[in-house]
A protein has these predicted regions:
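Surface-exposed extracellular loop regions of Gram-negative outer-membrane beta-barrel proteins
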Residues: 1, 105-112, 116, 126-157, ...
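Phosphate/ribose-recognition catalytic cores of enzymes acting on nucleotide-derived substrates
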Residues: 45, 62-68, 80-84, 91-103, ...
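Short loop/turn motifs that connect adjacent beta-strands in outer-membrane beta-barrel proteins
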Residues: 5-11, 48-55, 95-101, 142-145, ...
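Outer-membrane beta-barrel transmembrane domain signature
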Residues: 89, 95-97, 109-136, 334, ...
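Amphipathic alpha-helical scaffolding segments
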Residues: 18, 62, 78, 108-110, ...
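Exposed, low-structure sequence patches enriched in small/polar residues
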Residues: 147-149, 153-412
Length: 412
């Protein structure tokens, strides 16, 4: 649910979401099933008068998430972990003149944990409440030739993880001949490894054990990943109306990069396998390009390719799930106002690690369509894996063959 009310100079936005994911692991796994329950509430105000000398935005969010089963303890009475995040964000922008402005942005996350977080017999706690604070001041210039964004990310953490980190927040674009752009950027910042991000990386992943024999069966929260730098140089051009191409190359450095790998253990009667979240410092060099064409918003075509070369300091096996090359192609057709049709192809080849099983490359040809039946009511459908290929989104878990998804969307 997402509702926005527009005032003269302000937008008020209220939104809420609920999610439930209940699924089984593959045969032979240490756990046989998992259940994720999530919900969130959002309320914010957005100042929309761009001519005002002083503008502001503010929002607050309440996010809740429960992981029902954790680390090889499915048969224990209660191993659920509950995560509550109180997220507050705001920024204030002051205009220097029509082309220049200065902004100070703040974001605070309060993490609260309950459930299977503490060893009752020893008192050791493996999921501690903590707070993160981001300070992001920046200067912006926007004129006919230059677009500059110069700032810094100052990340503080209280109660868990490294206390102080700093990364750049810089983007520069030079525009010439109206449709040619040379750009450079150096960005970074904290990537919160909350339960939602764990699910997005691998829903079948188990949290890391606390590593002490006296605490066997208890798990711990991963450190937050920090993007120390993601620097890119690129060139964009539009030599013909509706046509754009973009070539780029860059370097990314990640501290405590979150990944996962396959492990196994021998039980009394059989061998059990599981996927375990792990972390290491990684970096990667990347180059790529993309081209797009749009004809009067009726037909649009786009293609993109990126190649990456990864390196891990100590845990090279974690790179086996990383993308080595990514290619995509998309065709969008909008023949009438009510109908949208998409045909897309995605190919993702994973990094090859010596002595470790290579994941089958993602090879997905899919088609989708949406149609506005009435005002605010639309019907949609998607069909994936039209080629009926065998590949893996997650290590050891083959993707479905030819599959279909459809539904209704309401907007009021």
């Amino acid at each position: 649910v997402d509702y926005t009310h527009q005032f003269n100079k302000l937008d008020l936005n209220i939104a809420g979401n609920f999610g439930l994911s209940n699924f089984n692991f593959k045969p032979g796994s240490a756990n046989s099933k998992q259940k994720f329950t999530s919900g969130d509430f959002h309320a914010g105000i957005h100042f929309i008068d761009e001519t005002a000398p002083l503008r502001f935005n503010a929002e607050t969010n309440l996010l809740m998430y429960e992981r029902q089963h954790n680390m090889l303890n499915e048969h224990t009475d209660n191993t659920s972990l509950k995560e509550t995040i109180i997220r507050t964000k705001g920024d204030v922008t002051g205009a220097i003149n029509d082309q220049q402005s200065v902004t100070i942005a703040l974001a605070m996350n309060n993490f609260l944990y309950s459930g299977y977080t503490k060893n009752i017999s020893t008192g050791d706690e493996y999921f501690k409440n903590y707070t993160t604070l981001l300070l992001n001041p920046y200067y912006e210039l926007d004129n006919d030739d230059w677009k500059l964004h110069v700032g810094a990310n100052v990340d503080l953490s209280f109660g868990f993880d490294k206390t102080f980190r700093v990364s750049p927040d810089i983007t520069a674009q030079y525009i010439f001949s109206d449709s040619y752009v040379v750009y450079a950027k150096a960005t970074g910042g904290k990537l919160l490894n909350d339960f939602r991000r764990l699910e997005s990386i691998c829903p079948y992943g188990e949290l890391a054990d606390a590593h002490l024999s006296s605490t066997w069966g208890y798990v711990q929260r991963p450190y937050d990943t920090y993007e120390q730098i993601n620097g890119t140089l690129g060139f964009k051009a539009s030599p013909y109306p509706g046509v754009w191409f973009n070539i780029y190359g860059g370097y990314q450095n990640l501290k405590n990069d979150l990944s996962y790998s396959a492990f196994g253990r021998a039980s009394v009667t059989h061998f059990e396998s599981y996927l375990n979240f792990s972390q290491d410092n990684t970096d990667n060099l990347y180059v790529g390009g993309e081209v797009s064409y749009d004809y009067k918003e009726i037909v649009s075509l786009s293609a993109k390719y990126t190649y990456r070369k990864w390196d891990s300091k100590t845990e090279e096996y974690l790179l086996a799930v990383k993308p080595a090359s990514e290619m995509s192609f998309n065709v969008r057709i909008h023949p009438i106002s009510a109908l949208n049709i998409n045909l897309s192809y995605d190919y993702i080849n994973r990094e090859e690690v010596e002595g470790y099983a290579k994941m089958a490359a993602i090879n997905d040809l899919h088609i989708g369509a949406s149609y506005n039946v009435f005002k605010g009511v639309s019907v949609y459908a998607q069909v994936h894996n039209l080629l009926n290929k065998k590949y893996q989104y997650y290590l050891g878990y083959p993707a479905e063959g030819f599959n279909f998804l459809g539904g209704l969307s309401f907007r009021f």
